[in-house]
Amino acid sequence: MSRTDQLALAVSLLAVFAAALVAGNIFENVPHLEDEIAYVWQARLLVEGKLTIPSPQHEKSFLVPFVVDHNGERFGKYPPGWPLVLSLGVALGTRGLVNPILAGVGVWLTYLLGKRVFGPLVGLLAAALTLSSPFFLINSGSLLSHPLGLVLSAGFALLWLAAFGDRNAPRRWSYSLGAAVLMGLLILARPFTALGVALPFGLHGLYLLFYGGCTPEQRRQTRLHLLGFGALGLAFAGLHFLWQYRVTGDPFLNPYTLWWEYDKIGFGPGVGVTEDGHSLHIARINTRFSLRAAWRDLFGWSSYSWLFLPFGLLACLRKPKGLLLGVVFPSLVLIHIFYWIGSELFGPRYYYEGLYSLTLFSALGAAWLAGWRVEPDPEPQDYPGAVRQSSGGVGLLDRLRLRLAPAYSWFAERAASAVHQPALFKVRQYLVPMALVLLVAYNLVYFLPGRLWEMHGLYTISRSDLYPFLAPEAQELTPALIIVHSERWMSYGSLLELQDPRLTTPFIFAWSRGPIADEAVAADFPERNLFHYYVEEPGRFYLAPRDP
């Protein structure tokens, strides 16, 4: 392991520690969003090896956000990929460490991607920038599925480049099928995100079908591996539809629409919350807000987190593999135009799985400006196609590059001369690193603490909501049915942390829906002590509804 590898590993371990701090001190290791509550509910059920359970008799009183009741069965609306991973933490009693560990893996994979395509220094800088990112830390401390998505996306990209990054290199099934497995797992975790991640690589694969080698044998091997990749990917996609069939009885019924009928992909009436449905105008507004959040939360440099991206693009013009990594984020932005809602609270989290596009290109741009080495370690070129390529075996992209070479050379020479003048050589060597240090320091000292604290007590949910039920005197009241009197779901939803899906825990909670409904619920649990709980009076349990 090289010195740079050791530093990258240290940064990755630091990411685990930092994310765990955010999970414990900001989010208090409890779910806040409806999504998180549903994920935890699904994970607890998966520990039992179940996808569904029979719906409770009074399903509206025992509402769980984003958990659906359909045809007498109760199940989460989310695909099983992330709940299955989270269930490992639930089973081991380490639920709060699952995403921090995934965060560390995501940082390490970002380093490996940068090292492979741009060199170890760029990879290390990208890993460090990722660690400093408020966007990264907020999502890594949550119970959302995005950290898993980032690991699967980055791991897939790394294996794809190993399998198909050099169109003339020998193909290895371990790489091509490994890439298919990771893409398949992403489909089972976040299917729409998987589409956005796969889009640029799919276009690359189409190119390789026709120009994937200099010899007939190389092209045959490339096509065989691409077909194997596609077949395995389709098998995982089939598992997604099998899951939909298992929980809904219809392989093409999206459980999202069982909670909100309008929660669909596309445009027009019936899609989204507006009367006329989702439209390009709404998509433009959503995208603008999401990107504004991205430039704020990416590195915490006010609204200038994009500062080094143009220079990264300029430095990458001669690196097709780098461009392939760089378009993952824009691809996610593009496909989410078809979704009716944007994302800002946790940053633009629907684009999170393309985070490495931004961190790698920012690191590349900074390194290029500073005059650092931005070339990967040379790969061995002793396979047969390497010689033939130089003797005329070129494909479409190679021919296009040759045709554009004069124009590119003119542009590149002038850009380089503007930035890399000898008089500025020493200046930029020191100026760019100093600017980076100042920008990161600004984020760590001024922006990041406040941005993280904004998320503390999100939706008025806090671990302190659970304390009245954890007190020894409260435990003596169990087994108990608690009728929660609250106008908003948050005060009721925060207590679901103490309840299992089968309603067998010492405390179970029902959301009050009026005297008649509450009495009917109580009649179903004669073996439990009945109490009424008013969230504005924490720690006080009423034997009967209090007077208005």
Where are these regions (language model features)?
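Hydrophobic/aromatic-rich transmembrane helices and adjacent perimembrane loops
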Residues: 39-40, 139-140, 146, 189, ...
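Hydrophobic, aromatic-rich transmembrane alpha-helices
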Residues: 105-107, 204, 211, 288-326, ...
